[in-house]
Curated annotation (Swiss-Prot):
This is Glucagon-like peptide. InterPro entries: Glucagon_GIP_secretin_VIP. It comes from Hydrolagus colliei (Spotted ratfish). It is found in: Secreted. Disulfide bonds: none annotated.
Length: 38
């Protein structure tokens, strides 16, 4: 059933993008903390 596969693909892609964005914002936050320390 193509629709089911497509939906799950979109869901996993969304999760992937969300986690990627989370990791990016986390590393940006860490960078800011390090800058403040210097």
């Amino acid at each position: 059933h193509a629709d089911g596969i497509y939906t799950s693909d979109v869901a996993s892609l969304t999760d992937y993008l969300k986690s990627k964005r989370f990791v990016e914002s986390l590393s940006n936050y860490n960078k800011r903390q390090n800058d403040r320390r210097m």
